[in-house]
Every structure is written in C-alpha cells, then in structure tokens.
Amino acid sequence: MSIRIIPQDELGSSEKRTADMIPPLLFPRLKNVYNRRAERLRELAENNPLGDYLRFAALIAHAQEVVLYDHPLEMDLTARIKEANDQGKPPLDIHVLPRDKHWQKLLHSLIAELKPEMNGPALAVIENLEKASEQELEQMASALFASDFASVSSDKAPFIWAALSLYWAQMASLIPGKARAEYGEARQYCPVCGSMPVSSMVQIGTTQGLRYLHCNLCETEWHVVRVKCSNCEQSRDLHYWSLENEQAAVKAESCGDCGTYLKILYQEKDPKVEAVADDLASLVLDARMEQEGFARSSINPFLFPGEGE
C-alpha cells in the first residue's frame, strides 16, 4: 500500500515538516457527516425519479447521526496502529480486524430509531433483522466484507452496512498518528480499512483542486491524483461523461484499460455535493455507463448488487 499510518510515538521531524504538503488522508469528521448527508439526500429527492428511495436513504443517514451520539465508542487503537504499520496493512482491515458486539448494538439501535418511520416491505426487513441471531448477523457482515452479495439480500444489506459503517467510522475517527504517503500507488482501496470508494471528489478550501476518494465504509478520504484511473492507475484512455454539460458537478470517469468507471464530483461546480448522496442520486448516469460497456468500480452503501448481478 502507498499510504501508511505512522504511530504517534514514531513521528519524527521529517513527518512534522511535511505538514504543509498534500494530506494523504482525511480522517472522518463525524460531527457533520450524517446530518449533511441526510440533508443532501432530501434536497436531491426533489424532482428526482428516485425521490422516494433518496428520502428512505436520508432516514437511515439521520438515524446514524442519532445513534452515533447515543453510543459513543471508546477504544485505544495505539497497539493496533503499530502492529498494522509493521505488517504494512490497513489498521482497520475489514478482512482481519475482529468485530466486537458494538456494531450489533449499533444495528439494533438503528432499527429502533427507524421502526416508527418504516412501513410495508422495509418494516418487514428490519423486523426480520431484529429477530436474527448474533451468528446470523455476523455471517451477513462477513459476506458483505467478502463481496459475497448473493448471500445477503439487497434489502437487508443497507441496514447491516449502515451499522458496520458507523462502527468503522467511529474507530477511524479515533486513530492516533499521522498518515504518510510513500512511493508507489495501489490506492484503489481505503488505506484505513481496505474497503472500496463510493466516489471521488475534487475539493475546495484547504485542499482546493485535489481529488480524494471517499471510503464507502469508514468515511475516510484518501488522495489520488487526477487524470488517473482510480482502479488500475492507467491514464492513457480516460474519458469523462455527464448527463448535463462540461460544467456538470457530477461526472463519471471511465477507463478504457480496465473497463471500469467511478463518479467524480466537483465542489467548485456545486459546494453542496456529497460523496454518497450525489452518487446515489445520479443512477441515470450509471445506466448510461452500463450501456457504454463500463462496469462500476465502487459500491454505494445504500445500493448493493442483488443475486445474479
């Protein structure tokens, strides 16, 4: 991997002197992630053919905000950071890190928060999850992390992922130390947890003009240079697609080398764009990319593939 997190006690003067350079990682700022996402989803739901589903996703994002403050996480990750650094692995690697029962507590709290807002099939889904055993929930979590989407129904997956994401984001926000970029690439996966991005964003503010990929699990953002495929790192056959015009705030970056695409959002075109919400609200663009023969290189946390997809 090309971005490592250095334990705090190993930071030397060389790391401290690079403070004015491009930040390789932006850890999640949980104070505004979920509220902002919920607000953006509700805003995008207006005059959108997917309006009902966007409002449904907004309910989940709002519930995540409530549960975040009802169930804070206290955890010392110092030893974990050091061990992962020695191994050259992401510190919160989804394929290695043991899960404790905190994530299931978050899931049941999310269900309790959402139940009064749900009806019909959605209510039946969360009631089914409410009755599931700890072992069944762990099996579903492991299947999602292994990209075994056929083993978890696409209507249950967003709720399971919402709890896992909240748990991983809480852990990511507690990481002590500092990220350091190293030679080499291999940045298609999150350097913190090893999950995939949901989309990428060209930012404004202190990171003006820089592109960051946004993790679909732990909410961390990591820097990847522009005009380079985020999946295979080639740059010779990239194209940009939109349903509006060249000034569109949401585009798809396609790569002819690997045949995939990832959404790229531009804050300078619309400061309100949000990595998850704007990706979900632009599924018409996904349909166009599929027609053009490109496969999506990311997963939106509110939209998982069903069996056979």
UniProtKB/Swiss-Prot annotation:
One of its GO terms (molecular function) is ferric iron binding. GO terms for cellular component: cytosol. The lineage of its organism: Bacteria, Pseudomonadati, Pseudomonadota, Gammaproteobacteria, Enterobacterales. It comes from Salmonella typhi. This is Protein FdhE. One of its GO terms (biological process) is protein maturation. The keyword Endoplasmic reticulum does not apply. Belongs to the FdhE family. Its main location: cytoplasm. Necessary for formate dehydrogenase activity. SUPFAM superfamilies: FdhE-like. InterPro entries: FdhE-like_sf, FdhE_C, FdhE_central, FdhE_N, Formate_DH_accessory. Keywords: Cytoplasm.
